């Protein structure tokens, strides 16, 4: 195995100018990720330098067999933490040969929102808190849990340390460093309330880059869990009962909110979000009704509520924002399996472009 390890870690830049580009896209479920690699003649610094590519959409649930070709458009580049050197990860979106976005391509519509001059002028910032659960591969039960049984009640696990409280830290730390290497603006990690559940944060990131970075961070996490022999779940309520669910809280601000008098802008934006609560809930992730129960630090899915420092609210405003009269707010409704292209663009559209 030492030769295999040596080859995996082989530095190609010592012997060739060629690089490997791993093209990544979202699969047919809207949550699964796919990727394949190609050789390029030399280093690349911008997506516009990359060729489009294609794949068999009939094998991913994205095209019929008789017309199966789907075209990948490169959109964002990251350093490859697995191959290293000049090799890259490429986040793509998917189109028909005629140039129409396929139904699972949510980036295309998001890009239209973020390129709107009114949105661009507000320089929207996002900080996304991505929660996930690590599962034992063969039994699909959280790591650290006895097979067919349960650990002690919640309480000691949040940000906990020790072999009886923290499960999967090697995976989490590997992911943290790999994201930093890749150029993702990952800002932190922590153990969550349910044992075997973790969170990483991406941001602040501007506009559509926040969603690109979340997707690539998810991809890197899937690759690391593949190596580690565990399974990552983005199910918003992986274990029924008295256990916390998994969300993807979205922290958000605009230029106007970050400036003097911004708190009034924040309150107006929250009012707008309340008026479109049902539309946002419908777009914030599948199975979210199992998580948004009014318990375990959530608001009830049918009720819109906001408050300062209230983790049982739909929207939480921080004490610092209230005190300083400017800042950001946190939308606590998105589920862990949400599509960040949909969530980030919808928040911008509702708060900046929509007039009730």
Curated annotation (Swiss-Prot):
Q: Which reaction is catalysed here?
A: L-glutamate + NH4(+) + ATP = L-glutamine + ADP + phosphate + H(+)
Residue positions where Phosphoserine is found in the record = 2, 48
The listed locations are: Cytoplasm
Record PTM:
Phosphorylated by CRK3.
- Gene3D superfamilies to which the protein is assigned, alphabetical: Glutamine synthetase, N-terminal domain (3.10.20.70), Glutamine synthetase/guanido kinase, catalytic domain (3.30.590.10)
Q: Which UniProt keywords apply?
A: Acetylation, ATP-binding, Cytoplasm, Ligase, Nitrogen fixation, Nucleotide-binding, Phosphoprotein
- Report the residue ranges that make up the GS beta-grasp domain in this protein: 19-99
* Gene Ontology MF term list: ATP binding; copper ion binding; glutamine synthetase activity
SMART domains for the chain? Gln-synt_C
**Pfam families in the record:** Gln-synt_C (PF00120), Gln-synt_N (PF03951)
Which class of enzymes does this protein belong to? ligase
Please give the record's induction comment. By nitrogen deprivation, sucrose, glucose and fructose. Down-regulated by ammonium supply. Induced during leaf senescence.
Reported EC number(s) for this entry are: 6.3.1.2
> Which stretches of sequence are listed as region Disordered?
36-62
Tissue occurrence = Expressed in root tips, root hairs and epidermis. Ubiquitously expressed with higher levels in siliques and roots.
For the modification N-acetylserine, the affected residues are: 2
The main location is: cytoplasm
GO BP terms in the entry? glutamine biosynthetic process; leaf senescence; nitrate assimilation
Q: How does it assemble?
A: Homooctamer. Interacts with CRK3 and GRF3.
Name the chain's protein.
Answer: Glutamine synthetase cytosolic isozyme 1-1
Q: Which organism is it from?
A: Arabidopsis thaliana (Mouse-ear cress)
